[in-house]
Swiss-Prot record:
Family affiliation: Belongs to the PsaA/PsaB family.
Protein known as: Photosystem I P700 chlorophyll a apoprotein A1
Highest taxon in the source lineage: Eukaryota
Annotated membrane topology: Multi-pass membrane protein
Function: PsaA and PsaB bind P700, the primary electron donor of photosystem I (PSI), as well as the electron acceptors A0, A1 and FX. PSI is a plastocyanin/cytochrome c6-ferredoxin oxidoreductase, converting photonic excitation into a charge separation, which transfers an electron from the donor P700 chlorophyll pair to the spectroscopically characterized acceptors A0, A1, FX, FA and FB in turn. Oxidized P700 is reduced on the lumenal side of the thylakoid membrane by plastocyanin or cytochrome c6.
GO cellular component, one term: photosystem I
Keyword entries, A-Z: 4Fe-4S, Chlorophyll, Chloroplast, Chromophore, Electron transport, Iron, Iron-sulfur, Magnesium, Membrane, Metal-binding, Oxidoreductase, Photosynthesis, Photosystem I, Plastid, Thylakoid, Transmembrane, Transmembrane helix, Transport
UniProt remark on cofactor binding: P700 is a chlorophyll a/chlorophyll a' dimer, A0 is one or more chlorophyll a, A1 is one or both phylloquinones and FX is a shared 4Fe-4S iron-sulfur center.
Pfam family, one: PsaA_PsaB
Catalytic activity, EC: 1.97.1.12
Length: 751
């Protein structure tokens, strides 16, 4: 039996801060590079501006004091949130001032959402298309109108008030950022108190956040949406606070309100089943999730999170201790287990950030999967442009977050990892057998790449030879995704097998009937076949290669056989000095650089798959009980070959963006062209030798010297790392903007 010493049991938690630690002054604003002795001297060469941008937010470079770094990060978070509030306020203001929101509310099926009007300066007013409701503007695909309706916002005046509230909140956040750095700055112990932080974040942010949202949905959103669904004019609705203050009003819609809180305290909770439901599936009026299901979901989450926020030990003797939890995780093959991880996560914010980015990135991709299959807001399911935009948007965010996770994991390894404190724990053991991990992962990538592309090349070859009977397809040699089909069927049967309280399956994707709104498909069963089997293995390949590059960068960031002292060279370095061949582009930063390209590959294939699959097999119109899809179900045959992807998807569907000139969609045509140019321009940075450019610059400088117009600041060619950074940034920018314009011009035209 282990007896805990009494001094370990009592860990007094308090809010520890220092008053007036840093004087408020604008003086530093006028001194670029004030955080570095070298940069603050000003520029001698053009490299100065690059180093300024690279290091301005790298607080580790400014100071080694973890407390000061923590305060800077904490303060910067308030500034970031304030900027987000201003941005959101702008969204609401556009909805109030420049939109057809009220017209859309009256007829969300035929009126398209618009919250942007282009001013006529040199003829750009052509972009203002007729979106219905006697309004001309740019069609938006953000999903904000559908979100606002589900919140219960029924007038543009309410949007003005919300926009103003956002601005006031942003001012409060700016003040908080200044206050907690200059007036009352927390001590390091406050940042490192994980139990208290977990309790407050779980109970406060998530628990009370969900509870307040559930309250809003029950008291405001539900009655307003029920009346809107039944055809009541938004202008004739009672105001939101009327439903809150006048119980008789809401009781007419949901009779259990007349019983008050008695059923709650007597545990007769089923009495509330008129507004807290467990129906599953989609509302057949709006095509969105049942709002009563959504309110129930948030209430359940609130209970879970509020309970979760009471689990961790602070000033009382009960509860979990994170350090204890981690260190008790040992097994027969894991050595010291998680010993040392607590110290890592409380002393390295890069390690903490890495973990959070990996989880948030994965969550964003999960959100993308749910946004189309379980559309959360009314009428969003029949707004195909918005559905496609939200899927793509959440995929990109997920991809960038996951690459960021690898980047900060590598920075942690280089800057914060101490081998002496991590002897024979899980992290040490992973590092010790990194060669086995990477070589196995490499083999998996080769296997997946050869076989997945091999299947396509087989099909391309036999298609060219005119032998369709020998191709892999649903009508010849079938490769059915049997496991995926089994999962679909299991979910479809859930109400009769596992979830007896559920009225219907969670989404029509699993099987069942088509859900259509005014003759337009909202969602329907998605059949999977050989074509999906093939492209899913391309997904597996691209994702595994991305992981291979990123994980290799992390595991070899401190040392490798080639450069045993890599840790001393830092997170990013071009080469290990002159005269050492083969040591260029092996830094952890270079792995992030390469990982970004493969992340781009992974996401492009996934969003292309989604776009084509939905147009082919889901989206369309219902006439005489028959579904007519946008591309007539051509995915199952067209996507079996690489040639088919090029011909039937990229080429066939780019006609709208290429022919958009002279129409309200012409901006997408120009963006498509411009983004291709930006993308192509990056190849000059990515395939280029620095020496060539430096020589060219020297000769241009020589000419300037001859004419006595030489600059004081010497021009320098970009370093290898700078060139790669500029290259990858614009490669991704060009690629994303090309895809964006291609998708939107297409789906707005045909959707």
């Amino acid at each position: 039996m282990t007896i805990t010493p009494p001094e370990q049991q009592v860990k007094r938690v308090r809010v520890a801060f220092v008053s007036n630690p840093v004087e408020t002054s604008f003086e530093k604003w006028s001194r670029p590079g004030h955080f570095s002795r070298l940069l603050s001297k000003g520029p001698n060469t053009t490299t100065w501006i690059w180093n300024l941008h690279a290091d301005a937010h790298d607080f580790d470079n400014h100071t080694t004091d973890l407390e000061d770094i923590s305060r800077k990060v904490f303060s910067a978070h308030f500034g970031q949130l304030a900027i987000i509030e201003i941005w959101l306020s702008g969204m609401f203001f556009h909805g109030a001032r420049f939109s057809n929101y009220e017209a859309w509310l009256l007829d969300p099926i035929h009126v398209k959402p618009s919250a942007q009007i282009v001013w006529p300066i040199v003829g750009q007013e052509i972009l203002n298309g007729d979106v219905g409701g006697n309004f001309q503007g740019i069609q938006i695909t953000s999903g904000l109108f559908q979100l606002w309706r589900s919140c219960g916002i029924t007038s543009e005046f309410q949007l003005y008030i919300t926009a103003l509230t956002g601005l006031i909140f942003s001012a409060v956040l700016f003040f908080a950022g200044w206050f907690h750095y200059h007036k009352a700055a927390p001590k390091l112990e406050w940042f490192q108190n994980v139990e208290s932080m977990l309790n407050h974040h779980l109970s406060g942010l998530l628990g009370l956040g969900c509870l307040s949202w559930a309250g809003h949905q029950i008291h405001v959103s539900l009655p307003i949406n029920k009346l809107l669904d039944s055809g009541v004019n938004p202008a004739e609705l009672p105001l939101p606070h009327d439903f809150i203050l006048d119980k008789s009003l809401i009781s007419q819609l949901y009779p259990s309100f007349s019983k008050g809180l008695a059923p709650f305290f007597t545990f007769h909770w089923s009495e509330y089943s008129d507004f807290l439901t467990f129906r599953g599936g989609l509302n057949n009026v709006t095509g969105g999730l049942w709002l009563t299901d959504v309110a129930h979901h948030h209430l359940a989450l609130a209970v879970l999170f509020i309970l979760a926020g009471h689990m961790y030990k602070t000033n009382w003797k009960i509860g979990h201790d994170i350090k204890g939890l981690l260190e008790s995780h040992t097994g027969p093959f894991t050595g010291q287990g998680h010993k040392g991880l607590y110290e890592i996560f409380t002393n390295s914010w890069h390690a903490q950030l890495s973990l959070n980015l990996a989880m948030m990135g994965s969550l964003s991709i999960i959100v993308a999967q749910h946004m189309y299959s379980m559309p959360p807001y009314p009428y969003i399911a029949i707004d195909y442009g918005t559905e496609l935009s939200l899927f793509t948007h959440h995929y990109w965010i997920g991809g960038f977050c996951i690459v960021g996770a690898a980047a900060h994991a590598a920075i942690f390894m280089v800057r914060d990892y101490d081998p002496a404190l991590n002897f024979n724990n899980l992290l040490d053991r992973v590092l010790l057998h990194r060669d086995a991990i990477i070589s196995h992962l490499n083999w998996v990538c080769i296997f997946l790449g050869l076989h997945s592309f091999g299947l396509y090349i087989h099909n391309d070859t036999l298609s060219a030879l005119g032998r369709p009977q020998d191709m892999f397809s649903d009508s010849a040699i079938q490769l059915q995704p049997v496991f995926a089909q089994w999962i679909q069927n299991t979910h479809y049967l859930a109400p009769t097998l596992t979830a007896f309280n559920l009225v219907s399956p969670t989404t029509p994707v699993w099987g069942g009937d088509v859900v259509s709104i005014s003759g337009k498909v909202a969602m329907m069963p998605i059949k999977l076949g050989t074509a999906d089997f093939l492209v899913h293995h391309i997904h597996a390949f691209t994702i595994h290669v991305t992981v291979l590059i990123l994980l290799k960068g992390v595991l070899f960031s401190r040392s490798s056989r080639l450069i045993p002292d890599k840790a001393s060279l830092g997170f990013r370095f071009p080469c290990d000095g002159p005269g050492r061949g083969g040591t260029c582009q092996v830094s952890a930063w270079d792995h992030v650089f390469l990982g970004l390209f493969w992340m781009y590959n992974s996401i492009s294939v996934a969003i292309f798959h989604f776009s084509w699959k939905m147009q082919s097999d889901v989206w369309g119109t219902v006439l005489a009980n028959k579904v007519s899809h946008i591309t007539g179900g051509n995915f199952s045959q067209g996507s079996l070959t690489i040639n088919g992807w090029l011909r039937d998807f990229l080429w066939a569907q780019s006609s709208q963006v290429i022919q958009s000139y002279g129409s309200p969609l012409s901006a997408y045509g120009l963006m498509f062209l411009g983004a291709h140019f930006v993308w192509a321009f990056t190849l000059m940075f990515l395939f280029s030798g620095r020496g060539y450019w430096q020589e060219l610059i020297e000769s241009i400088v020589w000419a300037h010297n001859k004419l006595k117009v030489a600059p004081n600041i010497q021009p320098r060619a970009l370093s290898i790392t700078q060139g790669r950074a500029v290259g990858v940034a614009h490669y991704l920018l060009g690629g994303i903007a090309t895809t964006w314009s291609f998708f939107l011009a297409r789906i707005i035209s045909v959707g």
